[in-house]
């Protein structure tokens, strides 16, 4: 996937992804309208130690993030935007365990619209696929882990996973690529409280206003650019409650 195509894919799926993520929000208490220093948002995901990935896995996922969401002069890439942090926290939680979904046999291959038909959880898929991808990269003439390969070589591997021409041991490379692309998109466009979309960079890129609760002053103002910065579940810097 070229940088231009990747950006087009991200923008084209943005509106659906900003409202449907794998994460489940905590309860947000308080009354509307919100006032500065009066909110009570759920706890934010903070970057730091990894909850699911090993350090080697995290380095690989961050490298993958910067190839799927490459940085440019306007917007940070997937690594800086926190996509790997988002995926890490998701895999460590209910999403990683497929919690709440029916995952009992028999497993019959269905249509793409029916979703995964397997007992393999997202956490298992990532753990096994990342290990297989590492073996594939180290066994190639380069002999290096994915994170240390040149960007051109990284793109070749991703293109091979997408097309099915790169085969990973014991896992379906195409299935992993589809899951990775979906999760990267969600991490890039989800509310920053879940670890990705750091500083609301993706929302600013597409002009998405976020979780503002009142647009009454703008309902009748057609073809005007909305001038206010986006707002997340936790508010924005000047809305953040002061710590006593």
Please provide the spans of the model-predicted regions:
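Sec-dependent signal peptide hydrophobic core
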Residues: 13-17
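C-terminal segment of N-terminal export signals and the immediately downstream linker at the start
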Residues: 3-8, 20-63
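Mature-region segments of soluble proteins
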Residues: 2, 45-46, 56-63, 74-244
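Basic side chains
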Residues: 6-7, 11, 154
